[in-house]
Amino acid sequence: MPQDAVTSPSRLSENQISEFQDLGVTVIRQCVDTHGLAELSRAIEEDIRSPGPFYHGYKSEEGSGRFHGNLRLWEHDSTFRKFCFSSPLPQIAAGFLESQKVNLLYDQLFVKEPGTLNRTRWHNDQPYWPIRGWQVLSFWIALDPVSRDSGALEFIAGSHRWDRWFQPKAFGDTAGQDEYTANPDYEPMPDIQNHRGDYEIVSWSLEPGDAYVFHGLTVHGSGGNQHQSRRRRGYAIRYTGDDAVYDTRVGTNTGLCSETHHDGMILDSDRYPVVWPAS
């Protein structure tokens, strides 16, 4: 994959970095070019045809549409691996996180086929993950035009600074992990959807190649894909910085855990590799 398939770190502005720090989310336009999108699209179709071991999916509650998701794709597909390791994304992550190094936590695929009306419930990501630390973010790259009626992500501005961890729940009747053990240190997610006016909700429409960048504690969710002919494909990469360490709290996603780490260990390993600076 050519380096210029992903935007250069030099294109990042101080406004984007401050927006990420203040709101917990920002957008990079034209983050991935048409060549990179074509490579990702081919890899996504291959995963749909022959899913990896961490596939999770469901049919729409209304009987039409389908959701396809997967985790840790980089471990068995060279295209995803190149995006995670060899693109400028790790260096861009270092800029947002103000970190001297960047580890790859994992990558993830989200495909809402046309007519998949299920909402993605409001949540923040880090309670699902076996890590602790402040320097944690995700890139969510759009492969299709994304609008409110096709499932654009919505974010609660500033929620990454609430210092609140919400109880993980499964996202529909999936083929993946279907329940999470209750953690007494977590709290239930407020009923944001029925009290939207009480929150500052921010969202952006995306074109193919645009990307959301958001903190691991930013509360977010999305609507269903109401289009009958347009898919909503998103590819996410999760990176961590200097202060992230392994932490298996009650209620984390077992598919993201490591057999060789114990709580408090730094992540650096084949399982959570250092991807910047490149070795």
Indicate residue ranges for each PLM-predicted region.
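Non-heme Fe(II)-dependent double-stranded beta-helix
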Residues: 1-23, 28-122, 127-130, 257, ...
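Short, charged/polar surface micro-motifs in flexible loops or helix N-caps
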Residues: 89, 99, 114-116, 146-148, ...
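Double-stranded beta-helix
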Residues: 148-219
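Non-heme Fe(II)/2-oxoglutarate
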Residues: 2-5, 50, 54, 58-59, ...
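Short, structured patches in soluble enzyme cores that scaffold and shape functional sites
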Residues: 108, 124, 141-145, 157
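Short, conserved beta-strand element in jelly-roll/cupin
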Residues: 130-148, 205-208, 213, 238-241
